[in-house]
Amino acid sequence: MKYEDLGVVPIINACGTVTRLGGAPLHVAALAAYDSAAQQSVAIEELQIAVSQQLSQWLECEAGLIASGAAAALTLGTAAILAGTDLARMETLPDTTRFPNELLIACDQRSGYDHAVRAAGAKIVAVGMNEVVSGAGVRRVEPWEYAAAITEQTAGILYVQTDSSRPLLADVIRVAKEHGLPVLVDAAGEIPPAENLKRLVDLGADLVAFSGGKAMRGPQATGLLLGTRTLVGSALLQMLDMDDHPTLWKAPVEFFDAGDVVGMPRHGIGRGLKVSKESIMAVMTALEKFLEPEQSKLMDACHDLLQRISAALNAAGVDTELIAHENHVPRLDVKINADQDAFEVCQCLRNSSPRVFVGHSRLEESVLVINAMAIRENEIEPLIAALLSQIH
């Protein structure tokens, strides 16, 4: 079956790796791994244990697992922080009224993705203030404000990693360690650079969530949760199908020491966040390719593609600016004439044939943003033609 059989018209995705537009093209090796994995059966717990060992070898972390997306990894990570190895707590989630349930977060790091954390039963507590945004000064959230917000109900700290995040993660981790609290980092879109896969854990974060799609080019509905052995193990237990016989099941020694887990947990709060064996093998293959040295060529290819688009638009009198980032995917800013409404141009592109979706982050500045990550070679000329048909 094809999309057209369902009456769905494929689009040109010039917006990037966003989930709402299907993400980036799956790496060809990941697609082959997906197909191969479908041909046999495996025990998912054993597969996740093997995955953890491989992630530990590649990324020099204690442990890791594959989740059904970065948001799922955040929910599982939160559940691990809230419940630890306590089976009674696992059983009661998301009811957390009888134990510490608050996660601190800088006020300017809150977003709709808070849902992924609150879904496990955590209460989000915003700390500090951003006087830059309010126009009241030059200060943002500072480390001491985290410390001041800690109470007996504090279970951990949630940190959203971007280049502009403040305070720096290292400073937040320092405060957390001083108070014996774990830090969960949302780094969903923070690769490239590949170094972040190691760096954030090396800084001392207890759990870090990454997307397995986006630039990694694994299945879009996959994610990585990296971190400490016991917390990753707790997250795994709360996701796995636990419908085994208690007499036949043992807590995996790869995650837990003797006596850590006193019995077999029932299905956990993450049961609905399961990930298939095919997706696990596909994202692991994509990650393996992403970690290869020649992976840097992907950014060069994106840059070259944008240069081609820019040259064609410039030749037709359209102003553009190619923004190259050392550690991030390059972008092309396409400037709209003053006599046109950028929002109308964007909407017309979506309604054109072929339908074209561009980045909308700078529409209020009369700029269309082009990201090359999901643009196929055979879409370049139709994309250029569509842009020129709408920009006067």
Predicted features and spans:
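Conserved C-terminal alpha-helix-loop-beta "cap" of PLP-dependent enzymes
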Residues: 2, 310-386
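Flexible, glycine/charged-enriched surface loops at secondary-structure junctions
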Residues: 44-49, 63-65, 247-249, 292-302, ...
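A structural motif shared across PLP-dependent enzymes of the aminotransferase-like
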Residues: 19-31, 41-50
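A non-catalytic, amphipathic alpha-helix used as a structural packing/dimerization or gating element
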Residues: 50, 54, 301-308
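Conserved PLP-enzyme active-site core in the AAT-like
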Residues: 2-21, 25, 52-278, 283-288, ...
